[in-house]
Structure formats: C-alpha cells, structure tokens
C-alpha cells in the first residue's frame, strides 16, 4: 500500500510491502551444500519513495513468544493476516530459491549431487518393491531433492529423455516430478516412470500448441523448463 506524504516542496510516498522473508546460511564442502542456519518470518518493509528512489525506512518483524500472533494480526491487513500466520504456505518455494542462489554462488555440480542422492535412496530397503518405501526410508534425501527444485527437474528431464528409465530410478523420478510440478500431474496409470514421462512430455507439447511460452512459464513452469530443453 502507498501513503502520500509531503516534506517541504518535495513530493514523497511511503510504500509498505507485506511479505514472508526467509534467510538461510550454507556451508560448502566436498561438493555439497550444508544448511547451517536461517530464519523464516512475516515482515513489513516500509520504503520512502522520492524522485524514483526507494529508501528503506523501517523493517518490521513480529516479537517472539506470546506476542507473535497478536503482533501479526495488528500489523497485517485482515485479508492477508492468515497467510502471514501460515509460514508453511510458501516455504518450499522460498527454500528452493535459497538453494538456487547458493548453487550459483558456490558453482555446485548439481547433477553429481542429485545423482548421489538418488543412489542413496535406491540402496535400501533392498527387499522393498514399492517406491514409496524407499522415499520413507530416505526422507532427508528426498527433501533435499525437493529443495534443489529446478535442478532436480533438469536432472529428471535429461534422464527420461535418454530413455529406458523402467526401473526403480524411473519410478522415483516420476514421483519427484509430480511433487515438484503438481500443476502438471497426469491422472493415468503407468507401468514405469518412462511410460509416464513419455505421456507427460506429449502433454507439454500439446500445451505449447495452445499457449505461448510466456503463458506456460507462468502457469506450467515445469513444462516451460522441459520445452526450453527440447526446442
């Protein structure tokens, strides 16, 4: 929201931005990112705007403990206060953005990292036949694959485009694809991950026949990444 103010002959405006801020700290060793700290909370940032220049004049955060909820309800507009209280609503997307920036900063070889995460997941339980059992046994590795976001999608697309992903790796990649891109999930039964992806890829091409890339980027971001790879 914007609030006009006057200071002598200079026209100014105060703009208040309501949002959810995340800060994460990483260390980097042996080619891998390690999360070592961070914070995640609602914030209100106030900018003073004059002559197209934005200056931060206030950075508000709620107090801890029993004041937390009441501070948010007092500060945030009624129509968005519930979103401010639900810290999980945007958390995965925000963590993915933090990971993306850390990857770029440290120049992480994401293909090698993601390959190792899948290798660890496939290692046990060796007697299981249900892919979900492997995910349950390696929830931390699977969560890490989720956090790598677009890099995991790039890996998945490359592997499926190579073909013959008919084993456990293909099934795990299919599940991860659906979790990373729920907006593009297919309602069909497929014997293998490769069979599922082949239909998924056909669907992406059909979407391209109906919409331009700008629309796809906004509404089907995973398909947008895939279509860029095959153009």
Residue ranges, per PLM feature:
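Low-complexity, intrinsically disordered terminal/linker segments enriched in charged
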Residues: 57-109
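Extended repeat-based scaffolds of very large eukaryotic assembly and lipid-transport proteins
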Residues: 109-231
